[in-house]
């Protein structure tokens, strides 16, 4: 079994280089290849010029055993990929009866007349194997030359994905006898990457050689991605789960979910399970917390509503924060968020009220309260819990990190995690 299989991905098109469209093809392809145990060595974008495409092909074939191209297979004059591949492989375009029959049937079903340009999509390099495109007109093409597999695909994302999902990935798996790859993601919040690494250092050091751990930090959370590879899928799945089970006791209070779980989903499930409701009072987050909570289907079962109290007048008029509290302590204070959380809970008749007030940035800070100073609060029928955050001067990150910090505070209170 070859454990070192590498791929190059080449996206073709002036529109990519000019920033007119975003290349999402290479991102998706590399993620899917990773699931097969194939590592992407390089991603490249190139213009619709034959000499540049040829240079890319020569370079890619020297470092990778798989070269995947997307784009340039359409019927217009600037679609030159097929002709360029003929130059590269020293071959010529020939008519393919199966592709032509597919085109004729497709145009008949759509009630359209096939013109000469459309028909030319049935011209393909003589040395390729056709990868049927059930989703459009341009066929995919597979070349296996001198130990390197080249796959040429349409640039239209849903057509490219369709061809690879229908036939391409299976052919790659068979051709290279790739191992099974399993990823398990442990999602944490409320803990930094370095602290997490210290907590699990012994466990990580003891991982077997066919498993690896990646730390994936982002605003408000750190993901731990455990990856294993092997020939026996069931055995590998069991061993991955054993490793997850063995590390959880060390970090359990920070773990909110696995794989596709989100913090807002986890909190929603806890609220539903405990038959509780929540209301939100937001200042610096401007409704982002409400957005996260309501992005989960079925949130009406536990989400009562929100007050976005951006101005002090709204804090006073709608949340009964006394003017003297605002005058003495300021909007960004423990005293203010405590009242906001308690009052929003009371006004909406919810089990829980939460709040946030702070200086999201990039300006507005003072020496006493610099940019990134944020207070959050949690209130239920028996207590009010507050937490001070000291974040950065990046507004978007501060808004998201504050909302996630509130959700994590709710999670820990509901699970009674200290």
Swiss-Prot record:
SUPFAM superfamilies: CinA-like, Molybdenum cofactor biosynthesis proteins. CDD domains: cinA. It comes from the Bacteria. Coiled coil: none annotated. Belongs to the CinA family. This is CinA-like protein.
């Amino acid at each position: 079994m070859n454990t070192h299989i590498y791929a190059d991905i080449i996206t073709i098109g002036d529109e990519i280089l000019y920033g007119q469209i975003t290349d999402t093809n290479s991102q998706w392809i590399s993620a899917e290849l990773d699931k097969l145990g194939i590592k992407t060595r390089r991603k490249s974008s190139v213009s619709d010029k034959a000499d540049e495409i040829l240079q890319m092909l020569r370079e890619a074939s020297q470092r990778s055993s798989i070269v995947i191209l997307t784009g340039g297979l359409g019927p217009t004059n600037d679609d030159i990929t097929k002709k360029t591949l003929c130059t590269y492989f020293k071959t010529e375009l020939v008519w393919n009866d199966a592709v032509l029959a597919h085109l004729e049937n497709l145009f008949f079903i759509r009630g359209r007349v096939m013109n000469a340009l459309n028909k030319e999509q049935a011209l393909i390099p003589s040395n390729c194997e056709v990868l049927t495109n059930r989703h459009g007109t341009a066929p995919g093409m597979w070349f296996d030359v001198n130990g390197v597999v080249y796959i040429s695909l349409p640039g239209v994302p849903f057509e490219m994905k369709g061809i690879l999902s229908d036939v391409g990935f299976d052919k790659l798996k068979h051709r290279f006898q790739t191992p099974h790859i399993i990823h398990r993601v442990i999602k944490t919040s409320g803990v930094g990457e370095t602290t997490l690494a210290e907590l699990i250092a012994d466990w990580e050091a003891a991982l077997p050689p066919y498993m690896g751990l990646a730390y994936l930090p982002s605003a408000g959370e750190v993901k731990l991605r455990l990856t294993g590879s092997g020939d026996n899928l069931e055995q590998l799945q069991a061993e991955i789960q054993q490793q997850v089970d063995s590390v959880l006791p060390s970090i359990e209070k920070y773990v909110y979910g696995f794989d596709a779980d989100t913090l807002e989903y986890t909190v929603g499930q806890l609220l539903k399970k405990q038959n509780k409701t929540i209301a939100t009072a937001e200042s610096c987050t401007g409704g982002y917390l409400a957005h996260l909570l309501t992005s989960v289907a079925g949130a009406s079962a536990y989400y009562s509503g929100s007050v976005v109290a951006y101005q002090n007048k709204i804090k006073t008029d709608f949340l009964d924060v006394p003017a003297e509290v605002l005058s003495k302590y300021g909007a960004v204070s423990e005293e203010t968020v405590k009242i906001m959380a308690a009052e929003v809970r009371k006004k909406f008749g919810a089990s829980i009220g939460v709040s946030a007030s702070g200086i999201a940035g990039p300006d507005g800070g003072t020496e006493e309260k610099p940019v990134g100073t944020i207070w959050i609060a949690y209130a239920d029928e028996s207590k009010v819990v507050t937490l001070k955050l000291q974040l950065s001067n990046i507004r978007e990150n501060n808004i998201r990190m504050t909302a996630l910090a509130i959700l994590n505070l709710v999670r820990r209170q509901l699970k009674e995690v200290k």
